[in-house]
Design a protein with these regions (language model features):
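N-terminal small-residue-enriched
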Residues: 1-474
Length: 474
């Protein structure tokens, strides 16, 4: 659904001349760069508990954030109003926070920068869908899940939709604008068998409008809930220790994101807080490994047309054939390193300044097949679903709780396992990968990354074999 420049200017009640003046005023204190981020986001959500709508809501977040850079100093201020006085006060505050002295406003000429490709075009946005249109979809999903298994005792299905109108302008004269949709459909189910309780959760999230709601999506979610339930009831806690671990394709990518991906973000490297700070151009893992952070996958939760600094989204190789080739940059870190920004300057909302953040992070497929990887392991663990975990971002030390997996014995998956965690160091685990599968899967769940502020992300990985990790068991 294309909207032209005038739609955004009218929405935020600003003119190009005002944008030019605000950016120039932000530099009066001696700053070198100023940008403005306007946002109008509508949120709506519904929750169906055991067939009854138990909660729902709608709200709007509206405002502008203004940032001024001067050397290593950053000034940031925001306003929930876009009237001339409020914006002028925010620009002045940002300039003062950046420790400006005295200066003069420079002439800035506005020019529009268009996205090379719209990665999430949509026909109908969530603002046009009230509860009377959405509830039937939730009811239908609940019915499909209920029909899957007689052991189901509780079903919760929920929907969350948002639409963000974004306008950005900076002191380079670059004007960018777009509308970002997001839809999330989730299910949480409780099963009971012989007095034993187990649960499963799943979600699907896309940068899409109401057209994402289809019968096939409902079937996919219901099938996902059903899969592996029998294994849950017979799973046991195995003996722990250091052993080979096979990571299943798809959701195991969260380990790649958390334990390894953050170490590639340029702010940590610029400050010397990452183990990769001095390793650019060096071999850090097997040559079969290439790791990508990608903002260009159509309709993907982590994709962007522009990042939150107005830089077009792109596909960035952090690791290519085992060599560290790039960090993930915002404008600040790109200036420090003397490179181009990679489109990773992201923020939670207009209330936050952008920082380097991941988008869709994944490892590219290798040449091995899943079966041969498992067959190569005499004794180990196969894991494919995780819940919570902890990571020391700089060093990469991690602990992840395994939601589901299997023992590997003599090259075969045998006993289902549960109540275990895997413990290791991300960069070391990366170096210990000895096989990469040919089955890359990008997980479509509602992943959200927290780094002082929340951002929607995606992750993926093919089947990989890590030579040794510590498994916490009995």
């Amino acid at each position: 659904m294309y909207k032209d420049k005038n739609f955004y200017l009218n929405l935020f009640q600003v003119s190009e001349a005002q944008l030019e003046r605000l950016a120039a005023d932000g530099l009066k204190g001696g700053g070198s760069y100023c940008d403005l981020f306007f946002e109008n986001t509508s949120y709506n959500d519904l929750l169906l508990r055991d067939g009854i709508v138990s909660s729902g809501g709608f709200h709007i977040d509206y405002g502008v954030g203004i940032r001024v850079l001067k050397g290593d100093k950053t000034g940031y201020a925001y306003s929930e109003s876009t009237d001339s006085r409020s914006m002028a006060e925010a620009a002045l505050a940002a300039s003062k926070i950046a420790e400006g002295g005295t200066g003069t406003a420079s002439a800035i000429c506005c020019r529009t920068v268009t996205a090379p490709k719209d990665r999430y075009s949509y026909e109908y946005d969530w603002r046009s869908s009230d509860a009377t249109r959405l509830v039937p979809w939730l009811e239908k999903l609940k019915e499909k899940i209920a029909a899957k298994d007689s052991r189901i005792v509780k079903i919760i299905v929920s929907f969350s939709g948002q639409v963000s109108d974004i306008l950005m302008f900076n002191s380079l004269g670059e004007l960018t604008f777009e509308t970002r949709p997001m839809g999330i459909l989730s299910a949480s189910v409780v099963f009971s068998q012989d007095g034993k309780i187990e649960s499963k959760n799943t979600s699907r999230a896309y940068r899409a409008g109401t057209e994402m709601l289809t019968e096939s999506l409902l079937d996919e979610i219901a099938d996902s809930i059903e899969a592996g339930i029998d294994d849950c009831f017979v799973a046991k806690r195995p003996k722990g220790g250091q052993m080979p671990v096979v990571m299943g394709a798809g959701a195991s990518g969260i380990l790649l994101h958390e334990a390894m991906g953050h170490a590639f973000e340029a702010d940590f490297n610029r400050k010397g807080q990452s183990v990769f700070s001095e390793k650019m151009g060096q071999k850090i893992c097997d040559e079969s490994i290439s790791i990508v952070d990608d903002g260009t996958i159509p309709f993907n939760r982590g994709s962007i047309n522009f990042d939150d600094e107005g830089v077009p989204g792109q596909k960035t190789y952090m690791v290519k054939d085992g060599i560290l080739t790039s960090y993930l940059h915002d404008r600040i870190s790109a200036g420090f390193y003397g490179v181009s920004p990679t489109g990773n300057g992201r923020r939670e909302s207009f209330r936050y300044a952008p920082i380097p953040r991941m988008r869709a992070t994944y490892m590219e497929s290798g040449k091995a097949d899943k079966e041969s990887i498992i067959a190569s392991v005499k004794k180990g663990i196969y894991v494919d679903q995780f819940s919570n975990g902890e990571v020391q971002i700089g060093e990469g030390d991690f602990t992840f709780f395994v939601k589901s997996g299997f023992l590997i014995e003599n090259g075969r998956l045998t006993q289902p396992v549960k109540d275990i965690n895997i413990i290791g160091n991300g960069p070391q685990a990366l170096a210990d990968i000895v096989a990469v599968g040919n089955d890359l899967k990008i997980d479509e769940g509602a992943w959200t990354c927290g780094k002082g502020q929340s951002c929607p992300v995606s992750c993926g990985i093919p089947t990989v074999l890590i030579n040794k990790l510590t498994v916490g068991g009995e």
